[in-house]
Amino acid sequence: MPQLRRNVPKISIQQPPFECFDNSEPEAPVWRKAVLVAPAEGGPWKELKERDCRLLSRREFLFRDFVSAHRVMPAYSTVAVAPHALLFPGDTTVNTSDVLPLLIAFEIDSPRCQEVVIAREGVNVSVNGRGADGGAWHFNEGGNFVVLAPENLNGHCALYGIGFPPESGLTAEAVRDTVLVRFPKLARLAPDRPFCTLNAQFQQSVREFQPLAAGALKLPEREAFLKEFPQAEPLAAGALVDDDAHLSFVLRRAEPVQPGDVTDPEFILYPDDCCAVIRPVEGRDIELCFDLGEQNIGCWNFSLFAAAGTVVDVAAIEYKTPNGALQHTGPGCRNSMRYICREGINRYTAMQRRSGRYVYVTLRNMTAPVRFQSFRLVESTYPVVPAGSFHCSDPAMNRIYEISQRTLKLCMEDTFTDCPLYEQTLWVGDARSESLFAMSSFGAYDLVRRCIRLAGQSLDDMPMVLSQVPTGWSCIIPAWSFMWSYSVYDYWFETGDAEFLREVWPMVKKNLEGAAACVDPETGLFSAPDWNFFDWNRTDCGHRIMLYNSFFHAEALRTAAELAPVAGEPELAEGWLAQRRNLIDALNRVWDARRLAWPDSIHEDGTLSGDVSIHTSMLAALFDAAWPEHQAAVRANTVTPRSELFKVVSPFALFYLYAALEKLGLPGEILDAIGRDYRPMLEVGATTVWENISLHFNPDSDFPTRSHCHAWSAAPLYFLPRLALGIIPAGPGCRKILISPVVNRFEYASGTRPTIHGRVGVRWKKQGRELHIQVTAPAEIEVEFLPNDTTFDFEVILSRSAE
């Protein structure tokens, strides 16, 4: 589309280019002719397949409130390049092991002698051979020589650039004689195997480039630079990235509006013919802030009357502190867009789905008053029905279930995604948890199947399932690869769908073959040069042997062995169980009897890590992987961990801790933990559940988490129906349901849980020494009451009716 500017940065690691739609040209745009890329079934897609999930919803969602209006400083002027485009044109990879070394140097004229605070992204900067002094760079009046050298070389760096504040008078138009220095012997593209922290070639390239960059930053003038780097080549202005609209929002400096600047801004909230009026102010732009009332995702839609060239910048954030500080989720996420107006009426619906709660609309380059008619969100999610529900005597638990369900919905498009704002990506480990949550909350079996298929297809190119798909980041997280295997088991257990199991069975086998090749012959443990990750805790994790990977591997072997007869290959089960026993024996041999725990890792020289965490013990409890003599300590580490054990940081890992507590027969403790872990979110008015537990991720930050909407944290959707309602599938296909509610935490509870046969509902209430339980279930489901420690003291009165 010609109006879409092409020379723009990416939104984030996994998202497409920044949306900048220039509609200011009065003439009809000239479209380029289409070019044949490949025959319909001959491209990298191999073949066309029928859609296997529903189209996304489109629902108008209005803002709840107009929050504020401000005058803000005009936009920063940026000088930036996209390193991939310069070094590897056409490449779309974002691997951390990619090496993107280059230098940019240019002359720029300053209108006066001044100190300037330069905004930077991904680069170190020198001006006339000097760095910053007290955070500011000194510019002479007239010509100045500027050098940019990348801080990091890896492929996650989408932009190398700087921004000049508007009051400095330094502009991109004043830049001249720009040169680029490439380092072809150091530049490389490489999949993340080995991962950058374990990649000797990547580390060597970094070591070789660092002194070159440091030397370049000390060069005071162009002539010295060209002498040092004779391979420098002119860089055309067209190779520079367009103005970075998001940078100007991040660095906004707000001032109060004055009378007459903005009239009737609340009119924008309503879809009628009334208009807010925003008038131009000399030397300032006007910013309007709106509140959706809760986090949401979709496409911005707006209508306004404006002069040609008026710029509309739209940016959204998830959270702002009580003192007004804005949290920009990142790093490197441009959760914004730009629209440049034509003369007269402008109506636009954004092409990219974006998320947030607080939305900032900044009008720039106004030459005449703007009449702003409407602004809304076209909500776009997977079209789910809330078949699951939960209500009990504790209002906080009801709200926790509600925001968990909303979070999951916002992280569902044509796949499960990690979050609606930062990446919008199918992370395979996240998807395993989200699949369980979605089956027990929405009955979204089609999306579960789709995610299993998509992730499994990565085995065409990799020995184990990739950590995220589809992707330009070829990275394996072994724990995620094993969790993909669990997803296959989870789906079969929930639905009894043997046909789908047989479809993906070759993928299950190949994933385990890749894992078997990673077993270290010396230790007998899983060892891989990958991103070895499970939780965001700050443990000793940069090594090939992380012990939690061996626990996950052992469980993947067990689940596959159970599935083998269903898939028609029962003879495979014994071999996998033997591998599992070998892994468990190897794990227990490295138990630290002094610290009564497993070391977190084994270093490349054979040294045992000095770190110990709760994670290995809770996985050993969950997966039945501890020798008898270690089980008491494993239980203690899981239930009452000592202070020296690294704790769980993310609600993602909490899911596995909760599951371990259930395995240990402590369902009440899980309900207590849900209240303890999620209440801090409620206390600050969260409308979705967070990526991290408050304050554990970064105790020194004003912001309690990175992502404020992360569906890997929606574990209450799984455990509240299972424990508080007591709805427990007893076998594959939910043909039989056990009813065993934990009743000593609440006075009453009710709700529903979907199954492949329809919804199962439970309503229970204590009346003196009687416990009344009403169950509704489809006729084909067998229902059985299972007493537990909390029900023994009651006379149970159970009734059942059809759904």
Task: List the predicted regions and their residue ranges.
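Solenoid-like repeat scaffolds
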Residues: 603-609, 639-647, 676-682
